[in-house]
């Protein structure tokens, strides 16, 4: 087939087809039928355009012999055969000069006489089938479709064939000749059978046997067989009268569509109750680090060695005591656990060689804190069949909690800049394609905006803690292992820094299933006095463990150092996602990228540089009771990142539900702002679905309060 193509077609056409296949990563040595099809399509496009001109009077004429004196303009602009970037440039230019609507897919030609884009099709199947596939894919009134077949048939939109009879006959004759030549060489059958439909059409394959019975059983109400349902779906017009559509779907439905006006929506009702509490797996804005710069000690990089080195930098330790007890816990056990950690670290230092990991003694306080022997005994269900009153144990409804100001403060803090660099610029090879150059430029600009951000610190801290905990859970299942909470960064001057936030002690961890829980006790340093916001620290027992000297503008001052201790738990699946928190960087980069793309398509050039370097321009960041908050592009990057990070830190079923349900209301409000006159039914049910997710989660409650601010300002 390849030899035939090279003999049969003009070398320029062959070269263009080779380029097209290379652009899509296809091998013409393997996909020979596709190679022939591309050449055929190119030739038909060129023949369609050949000899057709517009004269000075604006009339369409056919000129076969070049008359050098005639001032003629080509009637057709050829788009097919150009590389994608150039082709879109031509399309944009035509749209700008003629006012034509921009097509979704690249067409083949533009007709200056009839002012429309043309899609040419060449098919080895029936023309009407191919025509319908094309029309289904393009879904545009403005692109004219013209299909030719190898049997001399043709079909065009509204039977408007654009060209004169003779020009079309020339194309049909050429296609017939190609078919004959292929048949003579025994290539036609393979070529005819290799044609695939447009990718948007699903093949109709027959379903038989069990699958057929299951399909018939699982139809929506009022459909008696699969064909009946298929016919309904195929004939469903999406933009008809909604009430009619609903009544078609089920006899039970009699929804009345209510107009959605500015006065329709009410604010989301947030729950009353005691203030919500901190539930993240580690401290955020309240965390305190003991740090070493330019670490070069023996065993540097081994967590336990690093932790001991960091602990040695602090000299203000004192006899610990409880300043804020945990309401329901045995607080003396938390105190004893910290004393045990200090004592066992001291024992390590007295040893000749420091071990790589530390297994804690199974003392009564740690057994209590880690819930050892607390789980009810599991009994095989087979042994319980005869028990008459077997039932699942009752679980209490969660207590409703109200929004508290601390979660907004946490979010604001996450958007701020620190004086350290938390991520390095990725070392990626040289750019080879223009798109890679733009992508790496965007990535570098974005990295510069977020590398110092506190949310990025939380990412690196989360990745480290979850990785260390999952490793220990698998490697030392029965041990109470001591895991330092460590992060690494660079100072502004580029010096390496190792930070210790505190310690975790892991309980027994025979994790068979993804959701099996491993208990752990976290002990984290802080300078925050828990008595200022006791409701935030409901789940913690807080000790005072030392005094820290801090340098300030007025000289040195001493501040008490606290230790926040709590029992917590996590699972394999949660640790797996925690290890992948770097994805948050990617998600927020993609959101920024879509903003740049929107700007670039308006200006019709890449706006990355202007977007990041125009410091005077402000962008919307979010809603507050004061109105739409605006800030620099850097602030937008950091806010989007912080949102993504908090979605990971505070992930919960409440958040999933609230996000999914509130999005529906958001879309309706946006439709109202765009003057699309939206209608709704059962708006009360939607509010119910949103509000049942507002129970006690601080991040969900904050998002709901932001949503209310949005409603207020969007509907003014």
Curated annotation (Swiss-Prot):
One of its GO terms (cellular component) is host cell cytoplasm. Its EC number is 3.1.-.-. It holds the Pfam family Flu_PA. A motif (Nuclear localization signal 2 (NLS2)) lies at residues 184-247. Mn(2+) 2 binds at residues 80, 108. GO terms for biological process: cap snatching; DNA-templated transcription; symbiont-mediated suppression of host gene expression; symbiont-mediated suppression of host mRNA transcription via inhibition of RNA polymerase II activity; viral RNA genome replication; viral translational frameshifting. It is found in: Host cytoplasm; Host nucleus. Keywords: Cap snatching, Endonuclease, Eukaryotic host gene expression shutoff by virus, Eukaryotic host transcription shutoff by virus, Host cytoplasm, Host gene expression shutoff by virus, Host nucleus, Host-virus interaction, Hydrolase, Inhibition of host RNA polymerase II by virus, Manganese, Metal-binding, Nuclease, Phosphoprotein. Phosphorylated on serines and threonines by host kinases, including human casein kinase II. A motif (Nuclear localization signal 1 (NLS1)) lies at residues 124-139. It comes from the Viruses. The keyword Metal-binding applies. The keyword Magnesium does not apply. One of its GO terms (molecular function) is metal ion binding. Belongs to the influenza viruses PA family. Plays an essential role in viral RNA transcription and replication by forming the heterotrimeric polymerase complex together with PB1 and PB2 subunits. The complex transcribes viral mRNAs by using a unique mechanism called cap-snatching. It consists in the hijacking and cleavage of host capped pre-mRNAs. These short capped RNAs are then used as primers for viral mRNAs. The PB2 subunit is responsible for the binding of the 5' cap of cellular pre-mRNAs which are subsequently cleaved after 10-13 nucleotides by the PA subunit that carries the endonuclease activity. Influenza RNA polymerase is composed of three subunits: PB1, PB2 and PA. Interacts (via C-terminus) with PB1 (via N-terminus). This is Polymerase acidic protein. It comes from Influenza A virus (strain A/Swine/Colorado/1/1977 H3N2). The lineage of its organism: Viruses, Riboviria, Orthornavirae, Negarnaviricota, Polyploviricotina.
């Amino acid at each position: 087939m390849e030899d035939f193509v090279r003999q049969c077609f003009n070398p320029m056409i062959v070269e263009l087809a080779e380029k097209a296949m290379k652009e899509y990563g296809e091998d013409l040595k393997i996909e020979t039928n596709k190679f022939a099809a591309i050449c055929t399509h190119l030739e038909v496009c060129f023949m369609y355009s050949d000899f057709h001109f517009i004269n000075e009077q604006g009339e369409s004429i056919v000129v076969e012999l070049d008359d050098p004196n005639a001032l003629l303009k080509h009637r057709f602009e050829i788009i097919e055969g150009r590389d994608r970037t150039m082709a879109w440039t031509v399309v944009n230019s035509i749209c700008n000069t003629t006012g034509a609507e921009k097509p979704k897919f690249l067409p083949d030609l533009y007709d200056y006489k009839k002012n429309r884009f043309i899609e040419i099709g060449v098919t080895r199947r029936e023309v009407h089938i191919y025509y319908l596939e094309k029309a289904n894919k393009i879904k545009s009134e403005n692109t004219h479709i013209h299909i030719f077949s190898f049997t001399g048939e043709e079909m065009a939109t509204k039977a408007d064939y654009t060209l004169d009879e003779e020009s079309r006959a020339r194309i049909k004759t050429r296609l017939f000749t190609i078919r004959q030549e292929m048949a003579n060489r025994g290539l036609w059958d393979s070529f005819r059978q290799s044609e695939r439909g447009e990718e948007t059409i699903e093949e109709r394959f027959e379903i038989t046997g069990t699958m057929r019975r299951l399909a018939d059983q699982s139809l929506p109400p009022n459909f008696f067989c699969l064909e009946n349902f298929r016919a309904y779906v195929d004939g469903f017009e999406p933009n008809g009268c909604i009430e009619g559509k609903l009544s078609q779907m089920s006899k039970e439905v009699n929804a009345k569509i209510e107009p959605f006006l500015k006065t329709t929506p009410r604010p989301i009702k947030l729950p009353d109750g005691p203030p919500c509490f901190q539930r993240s797996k580690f401290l955020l804005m309240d965390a305190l680090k003991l740090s070493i710069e330019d670490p070069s000690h023996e065993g540097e990089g081994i967590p336990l060695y690093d932790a001991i080195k960091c602990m040695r930098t602090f000299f203000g330790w004192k006899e610990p005591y409880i300043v804020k007890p945990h309401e329901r816990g045995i607080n003396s056990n938390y105190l004893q656990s910290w004393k045990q950690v200090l004592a066992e670290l001291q024992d390590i230092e007295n040893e000749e060689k420091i071990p790589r990991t530390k297994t804690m003694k199974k003392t009564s306080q740690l057994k209590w804190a880690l819930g050892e022997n607390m789980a009810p005994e599991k009994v095989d269900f087979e042994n319980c069949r005869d028990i008459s009153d077997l039932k699942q144990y009752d679980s209490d409804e969660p207590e409703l909690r109200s929004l508290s100001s601390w979660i907004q403060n946490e979010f604001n803090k996450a958007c701020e800049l620190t004086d350290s660099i938390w991520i390095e610029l990725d070392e990626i090879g040289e750019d080879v394609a223009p798109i890679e150059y733009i992508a790496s430029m965007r990535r570098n600009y974005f990295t510069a905006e977020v590398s110092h951000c506190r949310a990025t610190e939380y990412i690196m801290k989360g990745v480290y803690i979850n990785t260390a905990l999952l490793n220990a859970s698998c490697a030392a299942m029965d041990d109470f292992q001591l895991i330092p909470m460590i992060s690494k960064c660079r100072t502004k001057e580029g010096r390496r820094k190792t930070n210790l936030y505190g310690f975790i002690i892991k309980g027994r961890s025979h994790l068979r299933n993804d959701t099996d829980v491993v208990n752990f006790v976290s002990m984290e340093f802080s300078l925050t006095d828990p008595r200022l916001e006791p409701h935030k620290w409901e789940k913690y027992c807080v000790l005072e463990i030392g005094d820290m000297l801090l340098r300030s503008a007025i000289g040195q001052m001493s501040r008490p150092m606290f230790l926040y201790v709590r029992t917590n738990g996590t699972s394999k699946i949660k640790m797996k996602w925690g290890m992948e928190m770097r994805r948050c960087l990617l998600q927020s980069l993609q959101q920024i990228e879509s903003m740049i793309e929107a700007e670039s398509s308006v200006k019709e050039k890449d706006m990355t540089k202007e977007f990041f370097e125009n410091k005077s321009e402000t962008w919307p960041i979010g809603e507050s009771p004061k109105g739409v908050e605006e800030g620099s592009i850097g602030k937008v990057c950091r806010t989007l990142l912080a949102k993504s990070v908090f979605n990971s830190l505070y992930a919960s079923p409440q958040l999933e539900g609230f996000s999914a349900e509130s999005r529906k209301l958001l879309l309706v409000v946006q439709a109202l702002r765009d003057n699309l006159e939206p209608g709704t039914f059962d708006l009360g049910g939607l509010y119910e679905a949103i509000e049942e997710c507002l129970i006690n989660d601080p991040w969900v409650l904050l998002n709901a309060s932001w949503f209310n601010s949005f409603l207020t300002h969007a509907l003014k």
